[in-house]
Design a protein with these regions (language model features):
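N-terminal segment of the mature soluble domain
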Residues: 67-132
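A solvent-exposed, charged loop/short amphipathic helix patch at secondary-structure junctions
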Residues: 88-100, 152-164, 207-226
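C-terminal/domain-edge helix-coil "capping" segments
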Residues: 21-31, 44-63, 171-259
């Protein structure tokens, strides 16, 4: 087969797969934590005390010693703060930014609502979530497509993330999303916990622990997300929302699906 034919075949395959993008699950494994890239903006009170959080894939957290969340049955999600670097602000359309913060809010509500009442005012028994988006870099869709269409290009780029010191399956042009989050007592404003994390998109992701079908689904999802500017950001938001809900349930001694 000639190089031209191979190129045409690759283009056709990309178009076919891209048409199936909406059929792939978002999945929590299409992004991975990269603590080295976590941005410390001063939004949180003490970064030095943070350690790798249990149940997370790299997020750094601190929580008040002896914290008992059983006394809390409501949660308030404060208006999100956006503290991006100048070069990142220039690359984000204001309409996209609003859509992304709205998406994150709805994702948190979806994850937390089964176990806690969502309220809009602080008070006794309320955990207040303060969130700052600190990194927001869209995927360079053009570079992702070129890495796929160049014959054998995907072989080299599949290992480029690790070579550059990033997560396995990532490449230098994929989306990056960072946040800092603070959990406050709604009555006293005492800091209950704090976390920081940055998630990097994984174009070549595989969840090998979920079996062959799960690994294939994750690979397809990660691959297809690399052709959409903000898909990895939405995946990161969903991942954080589920992790927060899971940790809340563990500390409250209940199921994440029960109030």
């Amino acid at each position: 087969m000639s190089h031209q034919a191979k190129y045409a075949t690759a283009v056709g395959l990309l178009v076919l797969l891209n048409g199936c993008a909406n059929m792939a699950d978002s999945g929590s494994n299409v992004t991975a934590s990269d603590p080295k890239k976590a941005t410390r903006t001063g939004f949180l009170s003490n970064y030095a005390k943070m350690e790798k959080a249990p149940g997370g894939d790299g997020a750094l957290c601190w929580r008040q010693p002896g914290l008992d969340l059983k006394a809390y049955n409501q949660v308030m999600i404060s208006r999100m703060v956006v503290t991006l670097k100048d070069e990142q602000i220039k690359g984000v359309d204001p309409a996209d930014l609003k859509a992304l913060t709205d998406y994150f809010y709805k994702s948190l509500v979806t994850a937390l609502k089964p176990q806690m009442e969502i309220v809009d005012k602080p008070g006794a028994g309320v955990v207040v979530l303060r969130i700052a988006l600190t990194d927001l870099v869209p995927t360079s869709v053009g570079r992702s497509a070129m890495g796929t269409l160049i014959p054998y290009g995907f072989v080299a780029e599949a290992g480029s993330g690790v070579a550059a010191g990033g997560p396995a399956g990532s490449t230098p042009y994929l989306g990056q999303t960072g946040m800092e989050i603070q959990f406050l007592d709604g009555a006293t404003e005492a800091i209950l916990a704090e976390c920081i994390d940055t998630q990097i998109g994984r174009k070549y992701a595989a969840d090998v622990e979920s079996g062959a079908s799960g690994a294939t689904s994750t690979w397809i999802s990660g691959y297809m997300n690399s052709f959409q500017s903000w898909s990895y950001a939405r995946n990161a938001f969903d991942k954080w929302s589920k992790q927060i809900a899971k940790r809340f349930a563990e500390l409250r001694g209940i199921s994440p699906q029960a109030k």
